[in-house]
Structure formats: structure tokens, C-alpha cells
Amino acid sequence: MAWIPVHGVASVIALSLGCLVPPAPPRPDAPATLPACKVFILAGQSNMEGQGVVARRDDGGDEVAGTLAWIANDPRTASLVAHLRGADGAWASRDDVFTRYAPPGRPARTAPLGIGCTPHRDGNHFGPELALGHVLGDAIDGPVLLVKTAWGGKSLFTDFRPPSSGGMTGPCYAQMVAEVKAALAQAGEEIPALRGRRFELSGFVWYHGWNDGCDPKNAVPEYEQNLVNLVVDLRRDLGTP
């Protein structure tokens, strides 16, 4: 499994399209040739939750620059996001990539990849899963499940603190492990298209760093080792050697 720094200490993407763990035994009704569902963890704080805006207009009714709709409607940039729209111009979803996310204080929700996998209730936001899901879906021969374990304003120093860092294990670390285990156990029932599939934990995406950066005395000096410990402990607790 390759861990590739893509945005300094604040963002590390770890993707491996190969299986990280021995495949779980297939269910009795699963044909032997049915491709396994590749599972990716998307973890972090508010930016991983999803703060991208689909569309917004100013008081004069003009489209606000920088939104997804603005990019899609500008001839200079439309081609960059053309794959996100269907032939009718509506925002499209995929039938081979799915998301699972439990926003703060709410139960987990599963859905085909598309707009709205965020804590916002307005259906007008999206997160990194939207672009990443299309890349993975195009690259992988078989279904993909993106499990989001992201909660805004949380630090690695305290909230996501892994057991190997000593002190009290962070509640977000424990919740992340629990959410991933629940997804692996339940997604086959929650998502009809995945029924009968094997699930292979295949990658980890970490988009994080702001809160720790606000604590240069304590959190910043520990961030590198805490991140190493996070990876090591996740491998152990999720059975990924």
C-alpha cells in the first residue's frame, strides 16, 4: 500500500488498488467470478466532510464564481466536469460507486456516488469523494465503496489520536474504526447492488491538518509521528497487514 504526500502535512492520500487483506469468504449466494467491492476510507475534518458548493447566486441573481455549476457552465472549464452531468444536464450519479457516511449525530446513509454526501442537509454540497469516486470507478473493474469518516474541527493530537501515541485514544479514531467495520459488515444489505459481494479494504485517504496547525506548541511537533501511528494502528485494528 503506497502512502503518497499530496498536500504537505495537511493531506496524505494512500491508495492501493490491490487487495490489502485476504478476501473475506464469499457468501453462499455469491458467484465465484463476481468481482469484489473495493472499499476506500475517506477520513479527516471539515474539508473531507464536504464544503464544495454546487450552485449559488448573488442578490442580483447572477451565478457566484467558484461553484461547481459556475465551472460547468463556463466554456473555458466545462470540459473538466462534463462527466458529472447526464445527457439531460442534471447532476448524474454512478451505479458502480457508492458512498457511506454518518454525519455528526445522525445515522449512516448510503447512496450512489453523486451530490450530497456531506453533513449539509440542502443537497447543495459535495466533498472530495465526488472527483475521487469517478477516478476510482473508471480505473477499477468492479464496484467501489467510499466510507467517509470525517468530522469538522477535529485534531489528530486529541480527537483522532491513535492508541500507539499514548494517552487517551481519540473518540474519532474509535468511531472511524467502528464505522469502517460496520460498513464492511452491513454494506451488502444496505446497498442492493452490492448484495453477495466480497469486500476488500483497498485504500485510505487522509485530508486533515488545520486544527493541529493551530496548536504549534503541542500538536504540530507530534503530527508526523501521530500520523505514522494512525496508519500503523489502523492496519492492526482493521486487519490490514
Model-derived regions: residue spans:
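Bacterial N-terminal signal peptides
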Residues: 7-18
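Bacterial lipoprotein signal-peptidase II cleavage site
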Residues: 21-23
